[in-house]
Amino acid sequence: MSLLDWFAERRRQTSLNLTGSSPFDKERQVREIADGLWQKCPACDTLTYTKDLQQNWQVCPSCGHHHRITAPERLEQLLDPGSWQPLDEHLAPTDPLHFFDQKPYSERLATYQERTQLKDAVLTGLGSLEGIPVAIGVMDFRFMGGSMGSVVGEKIARLTERATCDHLPLILFSASGGARMQEGILSLMQMAKTSAALQRHRDARQLFISVLTHPTYGGVTASFAMLGDLILAEPGVQVGFAGPNVIEQTIGKGKLPEGFQTAEYLLAQGLIDAIVPRTELRKRLAQLLSMHRPRLHMSLPSIDSEALTLQPML
């Protein structure tokens, strides 16, 4: 038995032992999960070695559940190595309304910025995917639930305008609870601003692919997330404007349909174009981008029709 085989067998035995019912097994399970060596799937309760889960793009190998990932992880998974060029890194949110709930909005921002090492809930920039240049934006749900404030909307609008000017395809990954209430109307106006920028991108006949990740709600759903020329979603994603509980309490007509607001339900109703597992997403995006690239003949010189001589038909 090679050394690698020995480690694989040891890992397998450890995984089996962690399912035991003795107090010692339970204590070790808690300790090793706390140490970050193992992660428990919230869907099937399977324990997976953290490194194995990372190699599988944070997708449970047992049931296919897609764990939530960060914006930097998403970019690392998708883009060609060394191709990422961030844009508008200097933009940071302020507190124009001096909003206060349980604590000042400015303090809440500082807490999330320290916790996530992000200035706001989206990363935008340029890169390449399988050698194809793209403009890409990825929302990060860790930052205030991925809520869209003035900076998030501004960065997405600027990215879209850059893609329009540079004739680049645009890819946006959504993960949001909606507009950021702490910024009031300044957050709501981002819906119109991002939608207008995307219309100009469409008028320039450039491709926009929207990718829905869990969860996507509120003003993000009501604006750029559902405006893609192609709308993709990861399996099991929850997508909607208001949550199911809010809808049930508002309309007062009992339970909503089973699986309401899931990606699978939306696909069956024709609201999205495809459900793509995360492990296949890079390949599928590359295929779609390649299909929509300008054809070679479009760059050839045009033919002067007057210089042609028509031959008589026999």
UniProtKB/Swiss-Prot annotation:
<keyword id="KW-0444">Lipid biosynthesis</keyword>
<keyword id="KW-0067">ATP-binding</keyword>
<dbReference type="InterPro" id="IPR041010">
    <property type="entry name" value="Znf-ACC"/>
</dbReference>
<keyword id="KW-0547">Nucleotide-binding</keyword>
<dbReference type="InterPro" id="IPR000438">
    <property type="entry name" value="Acetyl_CoA_COase_Trfase_b_su"/>
</dbReference>
<protein>
    <recommendedName>
        <fullName>Acetyl-coenzyme A carboxylase carboxyl transferase subunit beta</fullName>
        <ecNumber>2.1.3.15</ecNumber>
    </recommendedName>
</protein>
<keyword id="KW-0276">Fatty acid metabolism</keyword>
<keyword id="KW-0963">Cytoplasm</keyword>
<dbReference type="GO" id="GO:0005524">
    <property type="term" value="F:ATP binding"/>
</dbReference>
<comment type="pathway">
    <text>Lipid metabolism; malonyl-CoA biosynthesis; malonyl-CoA from acetyl-CoA: step 1/1.</text>
</comment>
<keyword id="KW-0479">Metal-binding</keyword>
<dbReference type="GO" id="GO:0006633">
    <property type="term" value="P:fatty acid biosynthetic process"/>
</dbReference>
<dbReference type="GO" id="GO:0009317">
    <property type="term" value="C:acetyl-CoA carboxylase complex"/>
</dbReference>
<feature type="zinc finger region" description="C4-type">
    <location>
        <begin position="41"/>
        <end position="63"/>
    </location>
</feature>
<keyword id="KW-0808">Transferase</keyword>
<keyword id="KW-0275">Fatty acid biosynthesis</keyword>
<dbReference type="InterPro" id="IPR029045">
    <property type="entry name" value="ClpP/crotonase-like_dom_sf"/>
</dbReference>
<comment type="similarity">
    <text>Belongs to the AccD/PCCB family.</text>
</comment>
<dbReference type="Pfam" id="PF01039">
    <property type="entry name" value="Carboxyl_trans"/>
</dbReference>
<keyword id="KW-0862">Zinc</keyword>
<keyword id="KW-0443">Lipid metabolism</keyword>
<dbReference type="Pfam" id="PF17848">
    <property type="entry name" value="Zn_ribbon_ACC"/>
</dbReference>
<comment type="function">
    <text>Component of the acetyl coenzyme A carboxylase (ACC) complex. Biotin carboxylase (BC) catalyzes the carboxylation of biotin on its carrier protein (BCCP) and then the CO(2) group is transferred by the transcarboxylase to acetyl-CoA to form malonyl-CoA.</text>
</comment>
<dbReference type="GO" id="GO:0003989">
    <property type="term" value="F:acetyl-CoA carboxylase activity"/>
</dbReference>
<dbReference type="GO" id="GO:2001295">
    <property type="term" value="P:malonyl-CoA biosynthetic process"/>
</dbReference>
<dbReference type="GO" id="GO:0016743">
    <property type="term" value="F:carboxyl- or carbamoyltransferase activity"/>
</dbReference>
<dbReference type="InterPro" id="IPR011762">
    <property type="entry name" value="COA_CT_N"/>
</dbReference>
<feature type="binding site">
    <location>
        <position position="41"/>
    </location>
    <ligand>
        <name>Zn(2+)</name>
    </ligand>
</feature>
<feature type="domain" description="CoA carboxyltransferase N-terminal">
    <location>
        <begin position="37"/>
        <end position="307"/>
    </location>
</feature>
<comment type="subunit">
    <text>Acetyl-CoA carboxylase is a heterohexamer composed of biotin carboxyl carrier protein (AccB), biotin carboxylase (AccC) and two subunits each of ACCase subunit alpha (AccA) and ACCase subunit beta (AccD).</text>
</comment>
<keyword id="KW-0863">Zinc-finger</keyword>
<feature type="binding site">
    <location>
        <position position="63"/>
    </location>
    <ligand>
        <name>Zn(2+)</name>
    </ligand>
</feature>
<feature type="binding site">
    <location>
        <position position="60"/>
    </location>
    <ligand>
        <name>Zn(2+)</name>
    </ligand>
</feature>
<dbReference type="GO" id="GO:0008270">
    <property type="term" value="F:zinc ion binding"/>
</dbReference>
<dbReference type="InterPro" id="IPR034733">
    <property type="entry name" value="AcCoA_carboxyl_beta"/>
</dbReference>
<feature type="binding site">
    <location>
        <position position="44"/>
    </location>
    <ligand>
        <name>Zn(2+)</name>
    </ligand>
</feature>
